[in-house]
């Protein structure tokens, strides 16, 4: 019965993950144009510049949330309840300390913004940025210890609750933000609403963990060597987290410094599409994380373990590729027309920003399961090495290209770095260090790609000859393309 319940929870979780994705996209489609026209390009650019800056402090998590799943799975297999309680206590303590450090760092930045944005922001923008930075720093400081409860719920595979509570946040946030925007609170008002809803989610997760999942914790008397094991495991994940965060936020920060908030706004619109593109892949792979760790911890025969992990790698990859190929090819065909209608004048370059990010990212996104397989096998240091290379290449290229071609140059730099890391280095690591049959994986993907020939030909003629001057005609052609696909 328990196995059946877990199976149902995975199915419901996978379903709700796509409901959440759909909700995010629908809200973005309806809300973002309204927000852009109320805020204006510079104010929207300011909001994204500050969000990207403060988000860099999230690297202080040091990958501990991933370590929690690993050690929880180990203790759960042996039914070591007391060790789980002490694990909970250790994580709460560590994250509480990290939260304080993150808040203090954010507070320091808020009163010393000229250290980062000496020329990119005006005096008025700096004043608004200070308030936003304080709110976001407080949000980050509280969210760190609360993430222990999120990890606890995920470890129990209660994905339906996680996704349901986030769907509520996604759907309700615009209904609170729009009145504040109309009242003239601008980017500061948006930041305040984000803070309030995040606190609501945190509180809901705490109550659910304690009342429904019997969350308990104990401080002290930890297993000998536990913290050392956690630190060694998490330190390599931390490198990945830091590099991911740098690659995701670096472009906006550098554009804010060298090119101003208007160019950040153009970049942010393009990056938004890439963000939703990423969600399509991670939403399905997330529900397989506990199962991957269970296989690694329970299947002792290495050949059988690698066989099962390869099956998951291929299964998840094929599903992800089926969805992402439709989204990416569809954006290539319809993205330019959609951005013109949706965002309005001044955002034409956002189409190229999105393409420079989306196309190279596809390789990594259809292999998301491999990241967790590396972590479960404790060989994730190899991904860390490749990500360091990616970050350095991205940093150097972005500094030069963003000053020459603005937002498009910054996104092109990120795309080049992603191809180097994801297509070449990571696939070699998967094959050599995790035992995944990468050749079998790519054979499956190539066979699947044959089905794209007809849709691509159809898309070429639609993009070249079809009129898409309104939402109605655009929607009709999208339906035609999706039907052919």
Q: Residue spans of the language-model regions?
A:
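Transmembrane alpha-helical segments of multi-pass transport proteins
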Residues: 131-135, 232, 390, 404, ...
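Membrane-interface helix-loop junctions in multi-pass transport and translocation proteins
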Residues: 34-43, 160, 171-203, 381, ...
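Interfacial segments at transmembrane-helix termini and the short loops linking adjacent helices
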Residues: 110-135, 331-362, 434
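Membrane-interface junctions at transmembrane-helix termini in multi-pass inner-membrane proteins
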Residues: 7, 11, 140-166, 183-188, ...
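Transmembrane helical elements of multi-pass membrane transporters/channels
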Residues: 12-28, 193-205, 209, 224-294, ...
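Signature of the first transmembrane helix
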Residues: 9-74, 102-107, 139, 169-174, ...
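Helix-loop junctions and terminal segments of transmembrane helices
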Residues: 62-78, 92, 155, 213-214, ...
């Amino acid at each position: 019965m328990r196995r059946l319940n877990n199976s149902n929870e995975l199915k419901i979780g996978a379903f709700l993950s796509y409901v959440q994705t759909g909700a995010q996209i629908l809200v973005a489609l309806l809300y973002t144009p309204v927000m852009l026209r109320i805020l204006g390009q510079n104010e929207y650019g300011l909001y994204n510049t500050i969000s990207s800056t403060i988000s860099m402090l999230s690297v202080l998590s040091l990958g501990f949330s991933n370590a929690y799943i690993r050690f929880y799975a180990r203790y759960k297999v042996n039914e070591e309840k007391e060790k789980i309680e002490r694990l909970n206590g250790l994580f709460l303590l560590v994250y509480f300390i990290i939260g304080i450090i993150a808040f203090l760092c954010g507070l320091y930045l808020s009163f010393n913004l000229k250290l980062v944005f000496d020329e990119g922001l005006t005096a008025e923008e700096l004043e608004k940025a200070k308030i936003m930075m304080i709110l976001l720093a407080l949000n980050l400081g509280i969210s760190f210890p609360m993430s222990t409860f999120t990890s606890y719920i995920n470890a129990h595979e209660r994905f339906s609750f996680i996704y349901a509570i986030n769907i509520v946040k996604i759907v309700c946030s615009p209904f609170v933000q729009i009145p504040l925007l109309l009242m003239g609170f601008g980017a500061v008002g948006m930041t305040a609403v984000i803070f309030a809803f995040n606190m609501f989610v945190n509180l809901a997760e705490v109550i659910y963990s304690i009342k429904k999942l019997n969350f308990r914790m104990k401080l002290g008397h930890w297993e000998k060597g536990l913290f050392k094991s956690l630190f060694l495991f998490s330190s390599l994940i931390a490198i990945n987290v830091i590099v991911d965060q740098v690659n995701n936020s670096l472009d906006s920060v550098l554009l804010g410094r060298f090119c101003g908030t208007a160019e950040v706004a153009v970049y942010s619109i393009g990056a938004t599409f890439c963000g939703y593109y990423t969600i399509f892949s991670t939403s399905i792979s997330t529900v397989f994380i506990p199962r991957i760790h269970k296989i690694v911890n329970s299947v002792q025969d290495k050949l059988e373990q690698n066989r099962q992990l390869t099956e998951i790698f291929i299964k998840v990859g094929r599903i992800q590729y089926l969805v992402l190929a439709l989204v990416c090819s569809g954006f290539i065909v319809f993205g330019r027309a959609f951005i013109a209608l949706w965002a309005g004048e001044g955002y034409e370059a956002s189409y190229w920003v999105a393409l420079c990010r989306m196309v190279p990212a596809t390789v990594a996104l259809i292999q998301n399961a491999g990241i967790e397989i590396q972590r479960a096998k404790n060989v994730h240091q190899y991904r860390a090495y490749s990500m360091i290379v990616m970050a350095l290449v991205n940093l150097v290229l972005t500094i030069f290209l963003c000053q020459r071609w603005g937002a498009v140059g910054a996104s092109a730099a990120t795309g080049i770095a992603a191809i180097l890391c994801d297509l070449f280095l990571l696939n070699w690591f998967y094959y050599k260090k995790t035992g995944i049959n990468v050749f079998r994986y790519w054979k499956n993907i190539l066979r699947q790609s044959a089905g794209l020939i007809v849709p691509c030909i159809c898309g070429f003629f639609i993009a070249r000859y079809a009129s898409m001057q309104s939402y109605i005609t655009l929607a009709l052609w999208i339906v035609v393309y999706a039907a052919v696909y």
